From Swiss-Prot:
Residues 1268-1903 are cytoplasmic. Residues 1-26 form the signal peptide. This is Plexin-A4. Keywords: Cell membrane, Developmental protein, Disulfide bond, Glycoprotein, Membrane, Receptor, Repeat, Signal, Transmembrane, Transmembrane helix. CDD domains: IPT_PCSR (cd00603), IPT_plexin_repeat1 (cd01180), IPT_plexin_repeat3 (cd01181), RasGAP_plexin_A (cd12790). Belongs to the plexin family. Involved in the development of primary sensory neurons especially in branching of the peripheral axons. Interacts with the SLIT2 signaling specifically to promote axonal branching of Rohon-Beard neurons and the trigeminal sensory ganglion neurons.
Length: 1903
């Protein structure tokens, strides 16, 4: 027994060892790394938000770019790839340390200080870079250009300190070369920041060859009295404390060096700083000139510069650039093309520094020649002794010029007299271009082909391209590009070395922009009309490009550079009817090149035909009949089609013209037919419009002119009273006489939507009459109703009605309840007031005699008993002038009747004609009343003052005396806007009130009995008191009231300068005169939306405000700070504080709270702290001192808080029970859940009894188990003895099986790869593919069809769904909706997947928005996963949330193209290889087991004898075609054979397009006459015991090379012999078979499909009897080998398929494969996951690796590998499915980071690929690494890609149906969703709950 056990163990171990042996196979080559594609728009972004960019320099020799930033200097390639980074800071420093601490110790406190780059210059001579910073008083580094190696950093002399100012735009340097003989000099100019004793403002320095030499940066000349520098005198700071000179630009030209400056004015203007009391400093822009060789700076001259355009002065210099003039501009300026010109950008006015200046700006140009001439004139006049030196900042006192006899030429460099010198008169530049909204901030220019081109950057981040042709020709802005999303473009811009690109810089990014983008223009006119001189039209290539890029551009007319050279095309005829075909057309082409290669004529995508070229004339035909487009009625009577000429040389269309196909039959009326611009004729008797007049029935029936059309003529108003029988006679012309068989005329009146047909009589061709009838309309709301009238004949032939004649039905008694209203009606109506009936009616309807009528203009036409119903106002001043409005009945029909007959309180009241409404209203103006008159009623007489014509009011009118008491406030800003409240008495009297502040109105707003409010205007008289007057009608109310205009308030400081997106954080505002504003408001504007919040004034200099929220819903869900576009205050009408230009106010992301737990309830013990988790709890403010005011309530009790960035620690109050937790901060209120505080308690007696009982049961159970174990042991011993007897029989068969497996391993690879051909891959279309992934198993989903609702509800439902669609597109709503659903217990996993898929179908057309929502949900999911203490690796492992399914769907949408172009091919090859390899051996059709398998579960574990046959099959569609040879097995069932035959015949046909095997019969043809139908089961089927075996080919004894055919399934009995010559008494066993009615589907699913016959109890089997049946005989089992012996076949199959698995894995895990680049979606999502990991400080590479694996490979690729039917139109059998599952498991193991320890007990599918998985893992790791190294995808590029994907597939799903499906969840959880929206602050502000309730109302509406 022991011996047999050892033999068994040895045998089993051998098989396992075979599985673990490595395969002898060639290793796949490693894929090459992805090659980076350089796009034209390259961008280099800041590495750290604090390291903003300052300066830029480009090496014109090699194109390398050098970038000066805060704390860094970078060397970049021309394509902006970083090459070297050099650190310059930060370091410990204090700006008051002089000399700096690196020279000697400093007593000032040191802080870590950033180093701002202030100057970056290329020293070409010494191949080094000068980089000067703000640290240590402005020392400079000299860096080697090649590698930024520090050559020197002189810092120990005072000359080495340029300036301690840390503003990057305040210093400028110019290196001047003097040739090889002399060293270069550095001219440097800098602001000094109030420390002139340390730093000269301008100086010239030495540049030594040795970068470490002491003399580096020494002054060129320096002695006791003279030096090469100028300092600002200290006296200047006495006059202007904040004086400084800011240097904007510098350059050298000729013998001079020039600097452009901005400096405060000394005289005349108010001062700045603390002495200014809020006044604004006036600045002047000046140019400074120095001689290059002047060591004493005697040549220093400065001249003011400015620009005036349209009467507006532009004086604040922003940027400048020196360039050559160029031919065209030079001609306009009167200078040479190589002369220097200076471009300068100025902003409007002279107040404020450039950063705070006006948005209005101008680009101007100066000629250096004119500037130098002006300087020379000034020098000459000064040296004649004229005037003063005019340099107030340098010479505080005016110094007169000294006279000297000398000649001053163009190169005069001054003497030690009359120097330095200023020019007082401004040099005016020539304005070229102005901008009022987006301030220009930078400029650069160059000359291209004689054109001068300026490139201007703006504050809004745009680049403007301007062609400058001078004052004669003007300037043209021909293109604008948005380069930077936020922030201005900085002054420094530079061209690439070849001038093809421009480097544009902001604080956060450097971008390389092409100087031209010709390819954006798609037509010649656009191209040459754009104004870009770079661009021309390459004619035959039909593209806009530079000339050098156009092939053969030098040949005549191949390249157009002028718009007149564009190809022009005309065609004759230029229109034809849609019913004309193959008409010859003649095209004339102008400006075409030689066309010897030939042309085609193309009618868009409708037709194409050859053209015959004869010179510039081309002849071609119009489309043939089948190609002519059919014109739809809704599209009008014509369709314009573009007719193109296509060059046969290039294959491109190069010219086009419009061609019209017209369709006369569209016209349904004569006038529209003959009025058509095309050749349309009207057939009068056929009532049709045609292009062929010969088709009309009669010659006289043809109409071509409008005058000949049958038509109704204009008629007077046709009045018809209702319910009165009356004919309607109409004038007409050309009325046709109905012919034989045609019907007569009818009138059709459409009354309230209902047609009423009336017979009509044609008197002649010019008259028709609608016969006697009566008409009626519903309702009494309308006194008359215009009704459409149509005259028709012959049933539906309508007569044209060009005058739109209508019938006016009317009712006398509608809306005419009184006599006056009745008589006021239109006299043509014939209405009378029937006094007896006291109503308005027609005369004939009044049953009383005429004496009892009143009618308009009749003998008796005056209504009696007028009545007054209302009077306003009821009070007024005695002085009169009050307009009294009297409403009533019967108040006369003419103004003359009441003109002098109105009295109010016995005072004449003069009626006003403009206010009189006959019978209804009188407006009259009150006269002056006597003092004795106090009150009275209103009296009106109509015509005469007899009682029956007189009306008196029941209410009295009173005379009152208005009075004034006081006004408040009594002072306000000079700009106005103050709401003034005036108190008094009777101030609501009268009809009109006006308030005057001296001679100016105070705009009236509201009033009551004791108050009036008005808004003050800006004062025209200046500061001081003004008298206040009030007028009520003609009464002037006297009171000595004064209002004082005072100086406008100012804002000087704001603390803190930040808030959160939701606002409502307290801000302290400092300023002046704040107490004069009674309702101050603070405002923010962002993305064109404005929000405001309240402020409270505390003192004249202080107020407290609550920050407004950032008014843009998307910003609330961002995780990056945002700056508002405008931030300021609404202080009455003070404009200067409306938008503060000097604030750096920033908004940080809102704090985000997480739920306390998944259930929302957290269990706590008393005294335990409550921890609220989230993020952004501490805004990342500069200095790190940003704190928010949090309030946390437990129930209604606050708790003490400790705050960190991600946690709020709340010391819970002494409470027990359940309490809601509520957190408040800023404008946010959030409840993270409920805490349940429970105290500990000892075990109850019940619990003790329960525990004791459970213990007793456990002991009893253990005893029972021991007894059972003993009995089982005995049975095992007996079984073991039986096994030993079988071992000897099995041993001999092991060797044979292993030998066969090895042979298959060596021979099958070649056979399989040769069988697979490159047939077309049956990809599913996009819609089917996405539906199978989104909604697996659902074939006809509602989202694929139109919404189906009952007709009566359609309109309401569609309205509701449109509103619902708007809500889904609101991010606040959608996120709240998803979160609410996920929090519901009844919301199942299936529901989550369904909702995610439905949302993605709705958002298919808005993938940018869908991506944003997905990122937000994933971010939430990550936060929740980490906070729930789950292991981070579990993230995205399963699909338990909407976000996870949305992620799958997102990849499904975006990877379709990649599947089709790249990954689909190896996946399809693998599927085919598996299918083919499986079918080479037996497959059990019942169990699905196979001889060849990768899955142990689907392996036939016994020896099956089989033989391969070849059958010749007739093609079912064409029996005459050659027979198809098909390999089958003699052990195949009939259904399996049918499937193999169909596979062979329809090899390249998608599975859904080929016949079903179940619809076909297999016919075995024996000779010409005998045909036997084969079946899986028939009367010959063998049944043994209770087992029935399916028929196989061996059962029917089918031989090799047998002829078979697939024929449609017959309805007669199966398996009958078709042999007319065989005797009916034949003994054939196939005769007289009964019809089989239970035939199964012939393995359409190819899964085990035949189940036991339930009626007979017979079990069906094929090759192996199912192991689940326990009645197998012992002998049957004994005939099998030990099943594990056959595991070697797994290895053989694996070896055969290895190449295909490797190909698939290599394709998926390569960043570039088969010519396809990595899909953007993968890079974008992986970067997002990395960002999230960084955010949560997760640096474990295994976690990051696992996140990415769970995100893409395990979520998308595994699904696709296991289910290739999602991608291809194929069928997947159960054995193929099992094999693919093994491949998928291997794929999953390859993505795992954990080590798999394998042994003999491990699953076979793990052992199978154990040796390959380490290699696959390395592929995955390299793949993730390569992706992380690739350049990040910008949001702009990703959004463009997503928009394109949306556009391509935007109509795949029915949005209405999708919305309807989503709405079903609204219906289920309405209350919960509405509640969540009401609790969400953002949703409340947008009233989303209300909008949802509107949707619910529409959707639930029943009628």
């Amino acid at each position: 027994m022991a011996f047999h056990n050892r033999r068994w163990n040895f045998t089993f171990s051998c098989c396992v060892v075979v599985l673990l042996l490595p395969l002898v196979a060639a290793r796949p080559q490693q894929p090459s790394a992805a090659t980076r594609v350089h796009e034209e728009y390259s961008t280099f972004r800041v590495e750290n938000t604090e390291w903003t960019f300052n300066h830029l320099a480009v090496d014109h020799r090699n194109g390398n770019v050098y970038l000066g930033a805060v704390n860094r200097i970078y060397k970049l390639s021309p394509g902006l790839d970083i090459q070297v980074s050099h650190q310059t800071g930060p370091d410990e420093d204090n700006r008051n340390c002089y000399p700096p601490r690196i020279v000697q110790p400093c007593s000032e406190p040191l802080t870590l200080t950033n180093n701002v780059n202030k100057m970056l210059l290329m020293d070409y001579r010494e191949n080094r870079l000068l980089a000067c910073g703000s640290l240590y008083q402005g020392i400079c580094k000299l860096l080697r250009l090649d590698d930024l190696f520090k050559l020197g950093e002189p810092f120990h002399k005072k000359e080495h300190y340029l300036s301690g100012v840390n503003e990057s735009g305040s210093v400028f340097g110019v290196i001047v070369s003097y040739g090889d003989a002399s060293p270069d000099k550095l001219f440097v100019a800098t602001a000094v920041d109030g420390r002139p004793e340390y730093f000269p403002t301008i100086s010239s320095r030495k540049l030594t060859r040795n970068s470490e030499e002491d003399g580096m940066f020494a002054y060129v000349f320096h002695d006791e009295f003279v030096a090469s520098m100028i300092k600002i005198p200290s006296d200047t700071f006495t006059v202007v404390p904040d004086f400084d000179i800011y240097y904007v630009y510098g350059f050298s030209s000729g013998n001079f060096v020039y600097f452009l400056t901005l400096q405060p004015e000394m005289g005349g203007g108010p001062t700045t700083g603390s002495s200014s009391a809020g006044r604004e400093q006036v600045y002047t822009s000046k140019l400074v000139r120095l001689c290059k060789d002047d060591t004493a700076f005697n040549s220093y001259v400065e001249v003011p510069l400015g620009c005036v355009k349209g009467g507006v002065e532009y004086r604040l210099l922003q940027a400048a650039y020196l360039s050559k003039a160029g031919t065209i501009l030079a001609r306009s300026l009167g200078i040479g093309p190589d002369d220097d010109i200076l471009y300068a950008v100025f902003s409007k006015g002279q107040k404020r520094r450039p950063k705070e200046s006006s948005q209005e700006s101008a680009l101007c140009v100066f000629t250096l020649k004119e500037i130098n001439e002006r300087i020379k004139d000034r020098l000459q006049s000064c040296y004649k002794g004229e005037g003063t030196l005019d340099l107030a900042w340098l010479k505080v006192k005016d110094i007169s010029c000294s006279s000297a006899l000398l000649t001053i030429d163009d190169n005069f460099c001054g003497l030690d007299m009359n120097a330095p010198l200023g020019v007082s008169e401004m040099v005016r530049g020539i304005p070229l271009f102005s901008e009022s909204k987006d301030k220009m901030t930078s400029v650069i220019a160059y000359v291209y082909k004689n054109h001068s081109l300026a490139f201007v950057g703006t504050r809004g981040g745009r680049l403007k391209k301007i062609r400058v042709d001078g004052p004669t020709y003007g300037a043209l802005q021909y293109e604008t590009i948005q380069v930077v999303d936020n922030g201005p473009i900085l002054r420094d811009m530079a061209f690439s070395s070849d001038q093809h690109f421009l480097y544009v810089m902001s604080e956060s990014q450097l971008t390389r922009v092409p100087v031209e983008a010709c390819e954006q223009y798609s037509s010649c006119n656009e191209c040459l009309g754009s104004g870009d001189p770079h661009c021309g039209w390459c004619v035959l290539h039909s593209m806009c490009t530079r000339k050098e890029k156009c092939e053969r551009s030098s040949e005549p007319r191949r390249f157009a550079s002028n718009i007149k050279q564009c190809v022009r095309l005309s065609v004759h005829p230029n229109n034809i009817s849609v019913s004309q075909y193959s008409v010859m057309l003649v095209l004339e082409a102008h400006n075409v090149p030689e066309l010897s290669a030939g042309v085609n004529c193309t009618f868009e995508d409708l037709a194409e035909m050859d053209g015959l070229v004869e010179g510039n004339r081309i002849t071609c035909s119009s489309p043939a009949e089948k190609e002519v487009p059919r014109i739809i009625v809704d599209q009008g009577d014509h369709q314009i089609v573009q007719l193109y000429l296509k060059s046969k040389e290039t294959g491109l269309a190069f010219a086009n013209t419009s061609f019209v196909f017209y369709n006369c039959s569209v016209h349904k009326s004569c006038l529209s037919c003959v009025g058509s611009p095309y050749q349309c004729h009207w057939c009068k008797y056929r009532h049709t419009c045609t292009h062929d007049p010969s088709s009309c029935s009669f010659q006289e029936g043809r109409v071509k002119q409008p005058e000949e059309c049958p038509q109704l003529l204009p008629a007077d108003r046709i009045l018809v009273p209702v319910n009165v029988v009356k004919p309607i006679t109409l004038r007409a012309k050309n009325l046709p006489q109905p012919q034989s068989g045609q019907r007569g005329y009818e009138c059709v009146l459409t009354i309230q939507g209902v047609e009423q047909r009336v017979p009509a009589l044609r008197f002649n061709s010019s008259s028709v009459q609608c016969q006697n009838t009566s008409y009626m309309y519903d309702g009494m709301e309308m006194s008359s109703l215009p009704v459409d009238l149509t005259v028709i004949w012959n049933g539906d032939f309508s007569i044209d009605n060009p005058a739109q004649n209508k019938v006016h039905l009317y009712k006398c008694d509608a809306r005419r309840e009184s006599c006056g209203l009745c008589l006021k009606a239109d006299p043509l109506f014939g209405c009378v007031w029937c006094k007896g009936e006291n109503r308005c009616s027609l005369k004939q309807h009044c049953s009383y005699p005429q004496s009892m009528w009143l009618e308009h203009n009749g003998i008796n036409s005056k209504c009696t008993h007028p009545r007054i119903t209302k009077i306003t106002p009821l009070r007024g001043p005695r002085e009169g002038g009050t307009l009294v409005t009297i409403r009533g009945e019967n108040l006369g029909l003419e103004f003359s009747e009441i003109k002098d007959h109105v009295k109010v309180a016995d005072v004449e009241c003069t009626p006003v004609p403009e206010g009189y409404i006959p019978a209804e209203q009188i407006v009259c103006e009150m006269g002056k009343a006597e003092r004795s008159q106090f009150a009275g009623n209103v009296q009106v007489c109509v015509g005469e003052c007899r009682p029956e014509f007189m009306a008196k009011s029941s209410k009295y009118y009173y005379f009152v005396i208005p009075q004034l008491l006081s006004l408040k406030p009594s002072r306000g800003p000079i700009s106005g806007g103050t709401i003034v409240n005036i108190t008094g008495g009777n101030l609501d009297a009268g009809s009109n009130v006006s308030i005057m502040f001296k001679d100016q109105k105070c705009t009236y707003q509201r009033r009551g009995g004791q108050w009036i409010t008005c808004r003050s205007h800006a004062s025209m008289q200046g500061y001081g008191n003004v008298s206040v007057s009030v007028y009520v009608d003609k009464a002037h109310i006297h009171k000595d009231l004064k209002f004082e205009y005072v100086e406008d308030p100012t804002i000087t400081k704001l603390e803190p300068e930040w808030s959160i997106f939701s606002g409502n954080t307290p801000l302290t505002v400092s300023g002046t005169n704040l107490d004069i504003i009674h309702t101050p408001l603070i405002r923010a504007k962002y993305k064109n939306l404005e929000t405001i919040n309240i402020c409270q004034v505390l003192s004249p200099t202080t107020m407290q405000c609550m920050a407004p929220e950032l008014p843009y819903s998307i910003s609330k869900h961002k995780d990056v700070p945002e700056r508002p576009d405008e931030f300021g205050f609404i202080l009455d009408n003070v404009q200067s504080v409306l938008a503060l230009n000097n604030t750096n106010f920033v908004y940080y992301p809102n704090p985000v709270f997480e739920p306390l737990s998944v259930s929302g309830v957290q269990e706590l013990k008393p005294g335990s702290p409550i921890i609220l988790k989230g993020r952004n709890f501490l805004p990342p403010t500069p200095g790190g001192n940003g704190k928010l005011n949090y309030t946390v309530l437990i129930g209604d009790k606050p708790c003490a808080l400790t705050v960190s960035d991600t946690q709020l620690l709340c010391e819970s109050p002494n409470l027990t029970g359940r309490h809601k937790v509520l957190a408040r901060v800023g404008g946010i209120e959030f409840s993270p859940g409920v805490v349940h505080i429970t105290s500990d308690s000892p075990l109850s007696s019940t619990a003790v009894i329960s525990i004791a009982g459970a213990g007793g049961l456990l002991i009893f159970f253990i005893v029972i188990v021991l007894i059972a174990y003993k009995r089982k042991s005995r049975e095992s011993d007996l079984t073991l003895k039986r096994l030993q007897m079988q071992m000897d029989n099995l041993e001999s068969r092991v060797a044979l099986e292993c030998k066969e497996a090895f042979a298959e391993l060596q021979t099958d690879i070649h056979e399989l790869t040769s069988d697979l051909d490159g047939a077309g891959i049956p990809f599913l279309d996009y819609r089917t593919y996405t539906m199978r992934v989104l909604f697996p198993g659902i074939e006809e989903h509602p989202v694929l069809r139109d919404l189906e609702v009952p007709g009566y509800r359609q309109e309401q439902v569609e309205k509701g769904l449109k509103l619902f669609g708007q809500l889904i597109n609101n991010k606040v709503f959608l996120l709240s909706f998803i979160r609410t659903l996920e929090s519901q217990r009844g919301f199942s996993m299936r529901d989550r997947g369904n909702v995610a898929s439905l949302i993605m179908t709705v958002l298919q057309s808005k993938l940018e928005y869908a991506t944003d929502v997905l990122k937000h949900l994933l971010s939430d999911l990550i936060d929740k996963n980490l906070e729930s203490k789950n292991h981070p690796k579990l993230l995205l492992r399963r699909t338990e949330s909407v976000a996870e399914k949305m992620l799958t769907n997102w990849f499904t949408f975006l990877l379709y193209k990649f599947l089709k172009e790249c990954a689909g091919e190896p996946l399809f090859s693998l599927f085919c290889a598996i299918k083919q390899q499986m079918e080479k051996g037996p497959i059990d059709s019942i169990t699905g087991e196979a001889r060849y398998s990768l899955s142990e579960d689907k392996l036939i574990r016994q020896q099956i004898d089989y033989k391969t046959l070849v059958v010749n099959c007739m093609h079912p569609d064409n029996e005459k075609s050659p027979e198809v040879q098909v390999k089958v097995l003699n052990c195949d069932t009939v259904s399996q054979v049918k499937e193999k035959i169909l596979d062979a015949i329809y090899k390249n046909v998608p599975y859904s397009h080929r016949p079903k095997a179940s619809d076909m019969d297999l016919e075995w043809r024996q000779g010409r006459v005998v045909r036997v139908i084969l079946q899986d089961e028939d009367v010959t089927t063998k049944i043994e015991a209770d087992w029935k075996r399916l028929n196989m080919l061996s059962h029917y004894q089918v031989t090799d090379n047998a002829v078979v055919a697939l024929v449609p399934k017959q309805v007669t009995a199966y398996n009958s012999v078709n042999n007319s010559t065989v005797s009916r008494t034949s003994a054939s066993k196939y005769e007289n078979m009964i019809k089989y009615t239970g035939s199964p589907d012939s393995l359409r699913s190819r899964t085990p499909m035949i189940t036991p016959d339930l009626e007979s109890g017979v079990k069906v089997w094929h090759l192996v009897k199912n192991h689940e049946h326990g009645d197998q005989k012992e002998g049957d089992r004994g005939s099998k080998m030990v099943s594990e012996i056959y595991l070697t076949r797994l290895l053989a199959t694996k070896g055969t398929l290895q190449k295909f698995v490797d190909d698939l894995f290599e394709t998926i895990f390569s960043t570039a494969h088969r010519g396809s680049a990595l899909p953007l979606a993968i890079k974008y999502m992986f970067d997002f996951l990395d960002e999230q990991a960084d955010k949560h400080n997760i640096h474990d590479p295994h976690v990051r690796h696992t996140w990415k694996s769970n995100c893409l490979p395990l979520r998308f690729w595994v699904n696709v590998i296991k289910n290739p039917q999602f991608v291809f139109d194929i069928h997947k059998s159960s054995i193929t499915d099992a094999c693919l599952s093994v491949v998928a498991q291997t794929f999953m193991d390859s993505c795992s980071t954990s080590e798999h320890r394998l042994g003999k007990d491990s699953p076979s599918n793990k052992l199978l690929y154990a040796k390959d998985i380490p290699s696959y893992k390395s592929w995955v790791e390299r793949y993730y690494s390569d992706i992380s190294k690739m350049p990040a995808i910008s949001d702009q590029d990703m959004n463009a890609y997503l928009a394109e994907q949306s556009r391509m597939h935007m109509n795949e799903f029915n949005t209405m149906s999708s919305l309807s499906e989503i709405y079903s969840y609204i219906g289920k959880y309405t209350e919960e969703i509405v509640s969540a929206l009401e609790q969400d602050d953002g949703a409340r502000k947008q009233r989303l709950a209300y909008k949802l309730e509107q949707v619910v109302a529409f959707m639930s509406l029943e009628s």
